[in-house]
Structure formats: structure tokens, C-alpha cells
């Protein structure tokens, strides 16, 4: 199981190459991330 920044993302566990987790989904657009 691979998670982005050590964070589980709902049903998406393969978040290595994503910026963050939004609405239990991996997000790859910085605009979708809450900074």
C-alpha cells in the first residue's frame, strides 16, 4: 500500500505521485489542494 506523504486517501491507496488527498481521492492539481 502506497500513500502520499504517509497519508491514506480513502479508497485510493496509491497516492505516491499525487500532491494531496481531496474528498477521499488523490489529487494531482495543486489548485485542488487545501494549502
UniProtKB/Swiss-Prot annotation:
Tissue spec: Expressed by the venom duct.
Main location: secreted
GO CC annotation, single: extracellular region
Superkingdom as given in the UniProt entry: Eukaryota
Molecular functions per Gene Ontology: ion channel regulator activity; toxin activity
Keywords, sorted A to Z: Disulfide bond, Ion channel impairing toxin, Neurotoxin, Secreted, Toxin
Subcellular location per the Swiss-Prot or TrEMBL entry: Secreted
Keyword Disulfide bond: yes
Disulfide bond entries: 2-16, 9-21, 15-26, 20-33
Domain notes: The cysteine framework is XI (C-C-CC-CC-C-C).
Family in the record: Belongs to the conotoxin I1 superfamily.
Name of protein: Conotoxin M11.2
Amino acid at each position: 500500500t502506497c500513500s502520499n506523504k504517509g497519508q491514506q486517501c480513502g479508497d485510493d491507496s496509491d497516492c505516491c505521485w499525487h500532491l494531496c488527498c481531496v474528498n477521499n481521492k488523490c489529487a494531482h492539481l495543486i489548485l485542488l489542494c487545501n494549502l
